[in-house]
Curated annotation (Swiss-Prot):
Keyword Cytoplasm found: yes
Top-rank taxon: Bacteria
Keyword Cytoplasm: yes
Cystine residue pairs: none
Principal place of residence: cytoplasm
Biological role: Inhibits RpoS proteolysis by regulating RssB activity, thereby increasing the stability of the sigma stress factor RpoS during magnesium starvation.
Entry keywords, A to Z: Cytoplasm, Stress response
NCBIfam families attached to this UniProt entry: PRK09919.1
Protein name: Anti-adapter protein IraM
This protein's GO CC annotations: cytoplasm
């Protein structure tokens, strides 16, 4: 079964991400991984993680729930990454970010 990423929210201080996805139905997944799942990305879940572009990546999925518009709005409003000022300076202002490669291309 293939899943399509609709949107992703990252919490850089803890490395946790939330993605709204479409599979058989619209869902929200809560996970931790070293990869970023941007909107439009298509992947296949497997027991040990996910397959993305014919390569397997480890991923820890904490929860999968049916999509809830109110919950997604709450997650989006509490999003720490990327902060608005970063778009102007192209520099990440999060001193406590644990993500090694910024998915937004910030330095």
């Amino acid at each position: 079964m293939k899943w399509i990423v609709i949107d992703t929210v990252i919490q850089p201080t803890c490395g946790i991400s939330f993605s709204a996805i479409w599979g058989d139905m619209k869902m929200i997944i809560w996970y931790q991984s070293t990869i970023f799942l941007p909107p439009g990305r298509i992947f296949t879940p497997v027991k040990s993680g996910i397959i993305l572009k014919d390569k397997e990546y480890p991923i820890t999925i904490y929860n999968i729930a049916p999509f809830n518009k109110d919950l997604w709005s709450l997650l989006k409003s509490s999003q720490e990454c990327p902060p608005g000022e970063s778009k102007i300076t192209n520099k990440c202002l999060h001193n406590s970010c644990i993500i090694k490669i910024c998915p937004y291309g910030l330095k």
